[in-house]
Amino acid sequence: MSPDKSYERKIKIIMLQSQLQSIVEKFAVSATVSTIRPLGSGLINDTYLVVTEEKDQPDYVLQRINHEVFPDVDMVMRNIAIVTRHIRERLIAQGETDLRHHVLEFLPTVEDANRLYAEVDGHYWRLMVFIDHAVTKQEVNPESAHAAGQSFGHFQAMLADVPCQLGETIKDFHNMEFRIEQLKQACVEDRAGRFDEPAVQELLEQLGKRAEAMTEAERLGREGKLPKRVCHCDTKVNNMLFSEDGSEVLCVIDLDTVMPSFIFSDYGDFLRTAASTAAEDEPDFSKIQFRQDVFQAFTKGYLASARSFLTPLEIQMLPYAVVLFPYMQSVRFLWDYLNGDGYWKVQYPTHNLVRAQNQFELVKRVEEAMPAIKAFINSQLN
């Protein structure tokens, strides 16, 4: 790097530090900021570690909220405030003293003690306490799947008695009836001229045969037989913080999607990705199998934590949840393909069609495994 370019880079870093410092100062921070640096991959640089000088003060995480995905930032942060406050109260009641490592803590702004985000130049920022001596995991194996089941089940259990209603941060996110109506509308409009393709017609026929069964949750919900609960709605193994030695799950993170939903959102969506042997865009469908080891480990952990508050009908419908989410994702990928690939990024013209076919192949693998799935769940109830 030439001296001139090196100097320019240093100036840009100094300017960025100054801008970020001014954002941090909008929050009620009592510590002195030492440095601010990107946290995570650094590809987007929307998350920063705020290092403080004082040894008795925590470091912080400064994060920009993606208001394109979550346009109602106030609702997102209100939900998070309700959830984290309730978890903190439950942990205290259980005798937990190390709250810092077991629940996220967001700082209020200087101007408003009840507001947990600041608006700066049309962008929205929040500041939370950094949880040290913690790591995330990417690999899904039976051990991490069991930990995930326990953690997300415990998360739901702690929030089963939240006294106030949370908002829906992404409307109809896991509403199967809505997703099917979206697909029907895409077929009528046929924006990309793909409706008559043989592969599309074949997949539509197979999805249509299962549509009534896959919308059972919405029907039971309207009849008052199936409750909506506070769910995480983005259950992935990397949305948990583990202790450094990996022996303990400390905290569930990434709470932007926390909202009311059927419990299947957290149970089924985790298994959709974690229990498949192939990525969701793998074109060789022979590589797609349903991992019984991951399913059993996750289910065992989940029921150990969640069984105490689940209704008999919710438990009875857990097998339905396992097939629901790959089905839903197949519908959503096909919808995007028919609409001209405007939602998910694609690498080639039929990418979304392959994704839709891939997820439907997983549906078939789950259907084949259904007797074993039901038998294992029943074995955990005895």
PLM segments and residue spans:
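Activation of the activation-loop gatekeeper triad in protein kinase-fold domains
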Residues: 253-258
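N-terminal amphipathic/basic-hydrophobic helices that include classical n-h-c signal peptides
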Residues: 1-14
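Active-site activation/catalytic loop segments of kinase-like enzymes and analogous catalytic loops
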Residues: 260, 264-307, 324-343
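Conserved ATP-binding subdomain of kinase catalytic cores across diverse folds
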Residues: 36-39, 43-184, 188, 263, ...
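ATP-dependent phospho-/nucleotidyl transfer catalytic cores
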Residues: 37-41, 63-74, 131-146, 161-232, ...
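Juxta-kinase regulatory segment immediately upstream of eukaryotic protein kinase catalytic domains
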Residues: 13-36
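All-alpha amphipathic helical-bundle segments outside canonical DNA-binding/catalytic cores
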Residues: 143, 310-322
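Protein kinase-like catalytic core scaffold
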Residues: 60, 102, 126, 229, ...
